[in-house]
């Protein structure tokens, strides 16, 4: 059984490949949020004997049109086992896939899945480990939307701690459907020294890896349990791992962006468990999850009743040979000496480092705040959160939010209020969630949170509130949400925010806390030569042309067989038109860069255009109707249109279902557009005299 979660829309329509990592099916148990649904038992071994493991993942359509999800499941050797297809997923909706309910997966399945969609998608993965006797461990992390040639894993344990109980396990996936991956793994200890390189020098080369490296076949998964590496890593090991492709000179950049990974952190004698996504980097492009600006929305020092909650974070610089100079800005506590209740610290991280706020005498006990990291080198950051006084197994981890992911529009695919299993006596509340919103500049932001779920009247409910520094929003306490709520949220702000989400259940003993960071818009490099893929609907499509000036026939070459007519609105409110095979009726002969076009097609088609090296910086609006291409970055509609505030009455966007969405300034009850995507075609009614230049701000 799958439930639909309704969420906000807004990202540009594009083909998106999402690798979902480390999937298991063992014993359904009551541990899953879907506990109580019919599921078959499947008992077998796992990567590590932590208990009866299961995973689930929720996939959200963050595009503007209905999506088709195709889920392909692969075993650890890359063999495709089964497929699950969900057609016509509405824009903004999300589907939960529970592996314990997937009849096509064998007992004891341990592998991976790849979701393919014709719309942009986002995913959250939850792992549940039933340890028996009502004890549960849970962890969560974000799914990936692209592969990389290099993966940074800043936190690795092998038999660490006084009882040698802390360990990690690695699940590395080759997300390619055809390219073999040959990988090198470099472990560094807490002094930053190389502790292990796999494969070691002098070993026999595998035929598929003539340049060296461990073989990871296309679509397959490489698994390592660091508790079992006594012969390779020393006892009490704490450090980091970098996984990188070993490539030949003839391989292209595209062929090497094929790695994704996740790490589970666990204690072998307790229920403590967490998981985090590996942070990817593309050296050839200089882009990825590492950043010179990183945000941590939740930081504790001896906080909570009893003073046991603490946060630590682990840092890996992009280049181990170049130390990273970090400036840390803690916020916001009136006891701190800086402006707005802040504290600034400086530190240097060479090849690897730990920052422990509990050891900073300048931070007062009971501190609950946020942290902004500024570095002169790109860094990967993972934070852990736990109760350090003993007797409580709660442990969670999350990746720091890179600067490019902080946004004025943020998506949260999964939230709960009093959902699911209520414990053996039925008196527990079940699964619940919270949001932690951090204003990136430490100031005050006006934030609107819209919940979306099938249990809400009309499918959504929203409220607005100011956030200074950082703030919790706890769904258990929110009167807008009914008991049994399972859904999603979109957060729109007048300043960029970084958002952390968490879920937990009081129906079990153990460690049910899981954390994941929310999603900003797609952030991808678009150098000259990059392509923009437009899906033309059967019927009308309002779209942008971003290519060079050329004839209509040449510009539309990819889709010429399906296009019946093209219209372009003029400033005098008339239309230039082009009809297939009817030059005597056509007045439109040439397309110009950033033309907004109404295209009538006899069938669905794909139109591929080459993006310009420099996007447009403004568009001129005239009194009356304007058919305009928006060239700015993806933003909340209020921010995207801030330059023309007061100049227009309504803005429309046409969906593939032939219906118009609208934005009416200061009328949220009438508005159905929340975000404007880059390269969107818009119909705007300018209601003031004279022309105005709409400048697209970065």
Language-model features and meaning:
Residues 1-12:
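N-terminal Sec-pathway targeting helices
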Residues 11-20:
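Hydrophobic membrane-insertion alpha-helices, especially the h-region
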Residues 21-634, 640-698:
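Gly/Pro-rich, tryptophan- and cysteine-flecked surface segments typical
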């Amino acid at each position: 059984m799958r439930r639909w979660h309704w969420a906000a829309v807004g990202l540009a329509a594009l083909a998106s490949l999402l690798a979902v990592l480390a999937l298991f099916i063992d014993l359904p148990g009551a541990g899953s949020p879907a506990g109580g649904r019919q599921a078959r038992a499947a008992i077998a071994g796992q990567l590590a004997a932590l208990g009866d493991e299961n995973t689930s993942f929720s996939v959200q359509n963050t595009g503007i049109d209905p999506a088709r999800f195709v889920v392909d499941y692969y075993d650890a050797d890359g063999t495709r086992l089964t497929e699950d297809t969900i057609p016509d997923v509405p824009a903004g909706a999300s589907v939960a896939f529970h592996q314990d309910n997937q009849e096509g997966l064998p007992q004891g399945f341990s592998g991976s899945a790849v979701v393919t969609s014709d719309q942009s998608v986002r995913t959250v993965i939850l792992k549940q480990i039933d340890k028996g006797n009502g004890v549960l461990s849970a962890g969560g992390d974000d799914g990936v939307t692209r592969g990389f040639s290099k993966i940074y894993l800043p936190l690795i344990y092998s038999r660490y701690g006084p009882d040698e109980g802390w360990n990690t396990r690695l699940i590395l996936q080759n997300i390619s459907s055809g390219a073999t991956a040959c990988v090198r793994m470099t472990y560094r200890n807490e002094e930053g020294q190389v502790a292990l390189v796999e494969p070691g020098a002098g070993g026999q080369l595998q035929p598929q890896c003539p340049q060296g490296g461990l073989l990871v076949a296309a679509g397959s998964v490489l698994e390592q349990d660091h508790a079992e590496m006594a012969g390779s890593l020393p006892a009490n090991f704490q450090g980091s791992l970098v996984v990188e492709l070993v490539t030949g000179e003839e391989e292209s950049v595209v062929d090497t962006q094929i790695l994704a990974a996740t790490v589970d952190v666990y204690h072998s004698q307790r229920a403590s468990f967490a998981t985090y996504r590996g942070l990817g980097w593309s050296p050839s492009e200089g882009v990825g999850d590492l950043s010179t600006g990183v945000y941590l929305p939740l930081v504790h020092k001896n906080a909570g009743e009893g003073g046991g909650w603490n946060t630590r974070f682990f840092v890996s610089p992009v280049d181990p040979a170049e130390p990273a100079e970090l400036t840390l800005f803690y916020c916001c506590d009136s006891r701190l000496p800086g402006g707005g209740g802040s504290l600034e610290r400086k530190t240097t991280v060479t090849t690897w480092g730990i920052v422990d706020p509990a050891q900073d005498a300048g931070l007062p006990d009971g501190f609950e705040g946020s942290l902004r990291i500024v570095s002169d080198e790109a860094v990967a950051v993972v934070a852990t959160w736990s109760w350090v006084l003993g007797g409580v197994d709660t442990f969670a981890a999350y990746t720091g939010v890179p600067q490019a992911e902080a946004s004025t529009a943020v998506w949260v695919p999964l939230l709960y209020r009093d959902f699911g299993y209520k414990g053996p006596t039925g008196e527990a509340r079940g699964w619940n969630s919270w949001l932690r919103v951090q204003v990136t500049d430490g100031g005050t932001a006006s934030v609107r949170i819209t919940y979306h779920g099938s249990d809400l009247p009309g499918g959504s409910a929203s409220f607005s509130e100011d956030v200074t520094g950082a703030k919790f929003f706890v769904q258990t306490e929110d009167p807008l949400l009914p008991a049994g709520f399972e859904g999603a949220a979109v957060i729109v702000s007048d300043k960029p925010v970084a958002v952390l989400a968490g879920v937990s259940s009081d129906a079990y003993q153990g460690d049910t806390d899981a954390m994941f960071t929310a999603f900003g818009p797609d952030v991808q490099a678009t150098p000259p030569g990059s392509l923009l893929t437009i899906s033309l609907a059967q019927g009308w499509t309002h779209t942008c042309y971003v290519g060079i000036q050329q004839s209509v026939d040449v510009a539309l070459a990819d889709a010429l067989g399906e296009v019946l007519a093209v219209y372009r609105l003029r400033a005098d409110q008339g239309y230039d038109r082009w009809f297939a095979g009817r030059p005597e009726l056509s007045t439109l002969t040439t397309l110009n860069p950033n033309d907004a076009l109404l295209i009538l097609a006899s069938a669905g088609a794909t139109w591929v255009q080459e993006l310009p090296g420099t996007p447009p910086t403004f568009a001129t609006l005239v009194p009356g109707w304007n058919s305009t291409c928006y060239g700015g970055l993806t933003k909340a509609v209020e921010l995207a249109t801030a330059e023309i505030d007061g100049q227009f009455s309504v803005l429309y966007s046409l969906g593939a279902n032939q219906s118009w969405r609208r934005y009416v300034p200061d009328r949220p009850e009438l508005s159905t557009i929340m975000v404007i995507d880059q390269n969107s075609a818009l119909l705007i009614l300018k209601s003031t005299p004279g022309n105005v230049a709409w400048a697209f701000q970065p």
